[in-house]
């Protein structure tokens, strides 16, 4: 899964740099960090709702949405996956 996350993070970073027309990532960035942060919250709630009443496939789908929007927010903050990985390792000690 890490390879997929790193690949997706790279694509997100590129879209944020280039801001191509028609890019969903670019459209999120244009709406600002506050909007993206709210999307992360919305997607987190959707994961919770799915886990309580909508079944496994829906949980997987909503989790993918959550991870994508979280990666966009992290990129907008200039936070790398390596930084998050390091923090998780620190917490495992």
Curated annotation (Swiss-Prot):
Domain of life: Archaea
GO molecular function: ATP binding; phosphoribosyl-ATP diphosphatase activity
Pfam families cross-referenced by the UniProt entry: PRA-PH
Cited CDD domains: NTP-PPase_HisIE_like (cd11534)
Pathway given in the UniProt record: Amino-acid biosynthesis; L-histidine biosynthesis; L-histidine from 5-phospho-alpha-D-ribose 1-diphosphate: step 2/9
Gene3D superfamilies: MazG-like (1.10.287.1080)
Enzymatic class: hydrolase
The UniProt record lists the keyword Amino-acid biosynthesis: yes
Protein family membership: Belongs to the PRA-PH family.
Name of this chain's protein: Phosphoribosyl-ATP pyrophosphatase
Species this chain originates from: Metallosphaera sedula (strain ATCC 51363 / DSM 5348 / JCM 9185 / NBRC 15509 / TH2)
Encoding gene per record: hisE
